[in-house]
Amino acid sequence: MAKVWQFSEAEELFHLPFLDLLYSAQHVHRENFPHNEVQLAMLLSVKTGGCPENCSYCPQSAHYDTGLRKEPVMHVEKVLEAAKRAVELGATRFCIGAAWRGPRGKDLDIVCEMISRIKKLGLETCASLGLLSYEQAVSLKAAGLDFYNHNIDTSQEYYSKIITTRRFSDRIETLENVAKAGLKICSGGILGMGESNEDRIKMLVELSHLSFPPESIPINKLIPIPGTPLAEKNAVDPLDFVRIIALARIMFPKSYVRLSAGRESMSDELQTLCFIAGANSIFYGEKLLTSANSDPESDEKLLLKLGLLREKSKTAVDCSINLGS
């Protein structure tokens, strides 16, 4: 059973001497995962822009003028083409995101078709669609969804400073609905929004208090987007970022810890420290929803230099096969 952490013990770990913290995190990582493997996940926006939420970091919010063009839901065949490309590139997980407060009516039916078709490729499936009821989560599970992503973003105390169109408790309720439906949870946060290290630690503690803690934890570095309220925020301290990666690894020993948004601005050295600290998953590909991602060729070179191997798919399928609908 996963440990329920208290703030004081998590804070004590965070403030360990840096090398001691990384040593502990790497030890935990090696006890629970193949220590030279990295999971490659790919992310596709299947409905872009026009979101009614006012998340201060997000270029897809209808509240801000970021120059982003609103686009309708993608055709299923286009999504399937992207998923096949993901298999060819060596990804083992394919994530779809939609700029909604939550899916409605036929939108959920379309997403369910996407998921069932992607699943036939042998990929793990993940979706990020906003707030979700238990009944909607059950439908996604029946379609073959493995993971549901719903980041809590930051601590409960800091949450209202970055989002006011929904409550922190709404996020938790969706995560509980997802878990109750039998889906695995993917949930993490964003660093660099003006929050303190205390907020970052509390975010991880909150995740440990869920009925079913996340099996996948994305840690994002803020990408300041012109036109959003956080456009001028200062970058997070790199060593503090590594400390949070290490803390996530120790607190959630059996969960994937993913380097997510913001990796395109990280040096090879910073990413290497994150891998030492226990990160074992990255978003791969040129784009993350609407933002630039690290260049795939640069990723290949870094993984080769570090001797890191791609995690192998357990259920890979020949993409030349006609998978039907």
From Swiss-Prot:
Q: Which UniProt keywords apply?
A: 2Fe-2S, 4Fe-4S, Biotin biosynthesis, Iron, Iron-sulfur, Metal-binding, S-adenosyl-L-methionine, Transferase
The annotated pathway is: Cofactor biosynthesis; biotin biosynthesis; biotin from 7,8-diaminononanoate: step 2/2
Which CDD domains does this UniProt record tie to the protein? Radical_SAM (cd01335)
**What EC number(s) does the entry state?**
2.8.1.6
Query: What cofactor does this one take?
Result: [4Fe-4S] cluster; [2Fe-2S] cluster
Q: Which GO terms describe its molecular function?
A: 2 iron, 2 sulfur cluster binding; 4 iron, 4 sulfur cluster binding; biotin synthase activity; iron ion binding
| GO annotation terms (biological process) | biotin biosynthetic process
For the ligand ([2Fe-2S] cluster), the binding residues are 95, 126, 186, 258
Which residue range or ranges hold the Radical SAM core domain?
36-254
Q: How is the cofactor bound?
A: Binds 1 [4Fe-4S] cluster. The cluster is coordinated with 3 cysteines and an exchangeable S-adenosyl-L-methionine. Binds 1 [2Fe-2S] cluster. The cluster is coordinated with 3 cysteines and 1 arginine.
Please give the catalytic activity noted in the UniProt record: (4R,5S)-dethiobiotin + (sulfur carrier)-SH + 2 reduced [2Fe-2S]-[ferredoxin] + 2 S-adenosyl-L-methionine = (sulfur carrier)-H + biotin + 2 5'-deoxyadenosine + 2 L-methionine + 2 oxidized [2Fe-2S]-[ferredoxin]
Positions annotated to bind [4Fe-4S] cluster: 51, 55, 58
What protein family does this chain belong to?
Belongs to the radical SAM superfamily. Biotin synthase family.
Instruction: List the PANTHER family hit by this protein, alphabetically.
Output: BIOTIN SYNTHASE, BIOTIN SYNTHASE, MITOCHONDRIAL
What interactions and quaternary structure are annotated? Homodimer.
What is this protein's function per UniProt? Catalyzes the conversion of dethiobiotin (DTB) to biotin by the insertion of a sulfur atom into dethiobiotin via a radical-based mechanism.
**What name does this protein carry?**
Biotin synthase
Organism of this sequence: Neorickettsia sennetsu (strain ATCC VR-367 / Miyayama) (Ehrlichia sennetsu)
